[in-house]
From Swiss-Prot:
<dbReference type="InterPro" id="IPR000238">
    <property type="entry name" value="RbfA"/>
</dbReference>
<comment type="similarity">
    <text>Belongs to the RbfA family.</text>
</comment>
<dbReference type="InterPro" id="IPR015946">
    <property type="entry name" value="KH_dom-like_a/b"/>
</dbReference>
<comment type="subunit">
    <text>Monomer. Binds 30S ribosomal subunits, but not 50S ribosomal subunits or 70S ribosomes.</text>
</comment>
<comment type="function">
    <text>One of several proteins that assist in the late maturation steps of the functional core of the 30S ribosomal subunit. Associates with free 30S ribosomal subunits (but not with 30S subunits that are part of 70S ribosomes or polysomes). Required for efficient processing of 16S rRNA. May interact with the 5'-terminal helix region of 16S rRNA.</text>
</comment>
<feature type="region of interest" description="Disordered">
    <location>
        <begin position="127"/>
        <end position="146"/>
    </location>
</feature>
<dbReference type="GO" id="GO:0005829">
    <property type="term" value="C:cytosol"/>
</dbReference>
<dbReference type="GO" id="GO:0043024">
    <property type="term" value="F:ribosomal small subunit binding"/>
</dbReference>
<dbReference type="InterPro" id="IPR020053">
    <property type="entry name" value="Ribosome-bd_factorA_CS"/>
</dbReference>
<dbReference type="Pfam" id="PF02033">
    <property type="entry name" value="RBFA"/>
</dbReference>
<dbReference type="GO" id="GO:0030490">
    <property type="term" value="P:maturation of SSU-rRNA"/>
</dbReference>
<keyword id="KW-0963">Cytoplasm</keyword>
<keyword id="KW-0690">Ribosome biogenesis</keyword>
<dbReference type="InterPro" id="IPR023799">
    <property type="entry name" value="RbfA_dom_sf"/>
</dbReference>
<protein>
    <recommendedName>
        <fullName>Ribosome-binding factor A</fullName>
    </recommendedName>
</protein>
Amino acid sequence: MADPARAARLAQRIKVIVAEALRKQVKQPGVENITITETRVTNDLQHATIYYTIFGGTEARQEAEDSLAKSKGILRREVGKNLTIRLTPTLEFISDEVPETASHVEELIRLAKERDAELAARAARAEFAGEADPYKKPEDDEAAES
């Protein structure tokens, strides 16, 4: 087994190689909208999982997925040519859901800020339930003793 540091370095190198190959060599329609976000390689260096995002709607997403499936062989050949390892890892492309998750989290944060502002406005209008200063003062004790 390879050490995890080597797998991480190899993953970073594969990310660069695949991104460059998509930009320069793959002529499939739809690959111009693909951004490689992350790459992970197993510790035995036999399998690489490549995460990507696509700018555009569902039609662009489907076109990009088809283009990646068709160009997987070209990309694997480029990875093999540019790496100095005995076996070229298999490539698996997975759509990265980070942008959708991030927009959902941003929406939740916006709602929380709105609720905080509403609560602060209520607190500013609120009045004390009892006296303004609920603590006993020394002069109150002297007046009660006399």
